[in-house]
């Protein structure tokens, strides 16, 4: 995703899932916006974080939201996190010859109360993990996440780790910056979306 700078990540723990993404919208070396949304809430249990080309994000989200509502009406059951990830995977793969230029992280809580986290590449390959990162700053974010992630960490600790990983990416990746959106999806309780606004200043 070198053409459009962005970093997104996700962490799964026993108490829930954290999704986070930076606020900068850039293309090449030019900053187009410092207040861009890259995290989308599909329903009160599931969210998607994106890195990549910005027009593609909105189009994909509208399709996924509509399909998940329709499926829930037809079956009478709420969508699972894997339902969303698998549908998005199929959608991305169906455009493999003219691919969407995005990487996606799908996370949330299944109806049975189990946290789930998936990462998808532009062609729809899908992997389930405990922590993931995508975008131009993913290498730096992974380095910090591998150091701080531990089984049994709390949801609050996961949130702090996500923020620190994105701050590290902002320090090294010119396409990542200008604040962080953090979506917390707890096993018990309502999701919360928080914006942390700051700009990295040296000295």
Swiss-Prot record:
**What is the designated name of this protein?**
Proteasome subunit beta 1
The catalytic residues are 7 (nucleophile)
Keywords attached to this Swiss-Prot or TrEMBL record, sorted alphabetically, are: Autocatalytic cleavage, Cytoplasm, Hydrolase, Protease, Proteasome, Threonine protease, Zymogen
Coiled-coil stretches: none
Tell me the name of the encoding gene: psmB1
Family, according to the entry, reads as follows: Belongs to the peptidase T1B family.
Q: Which GO molecular function terms does the record list?
A: threonine-type endopeptidase activity
What is the species of this protein? Answer: Aeropyrum pernix (strain ATCC 700893 / DSM 11879 / JCM 9820 / NBRC 100138 / K1)
Which GO biological process categories is it annotated with? proteasomal protein catabolic process
**EC id:** 3.4.25.1
Where is it located? Cytoplasm
Q: How does it assemble?
A: The 20S proteasome core is composed of 14 alpha and 14 beta subunits that assemble into four stacked heptameric rings, resulting in a barrel-shaped structure. The two inner rings, each composed of seven catalytic beta subunits, are sandwiched by two outer rings, each composed of seven alpha subunits. The catalytic chamber with the active sites is on the inside of the barrel. Has a gated structure, the ends of the cylinder being occluded by the N-termini of the alpha-subunits. Is capped at one or both ends by the proteasome regulatory ATPase, PAN.
Removed propeptide positions: 1-6
Top-rank taxon, per record: Archaea
- Extract the NCBIfam families matched here: arc_protsome_B
Regulation of activity is described as: The formation of the proteasomal ATPase PAN-20S proteasome complex, via the docking of the C-termini of PAN into the intersubunit pockets in the alpha-rings, triggers opening of the gate for substrate entry. Interconversion between the open-gate and close-gate conformations leads to a dynamic regulation of the 20S proteasome proteolysis activity.
Reactions it catalyzes? Cleavage of peptide bonds with very broad specificity
Q: Which InterPro entries match?
A: Ntn_hydrolases_N, Pept_T1A_Psome_bsu_arc, Pept_T1A_subB, Proteasome_bsu_CS, Proteasome_sua/b, Proteasome_suB-type
| GO CC term, one of those recorded | proteasome core complex, beta-subunit complex
Functional summary from the UniProt entry: Component of the proteasome core, a large protease complex with broad specificity involved in protein degradation.
Instruction: Kindly indicate whether the keyword Protease belongs to this entry.
Output: yes
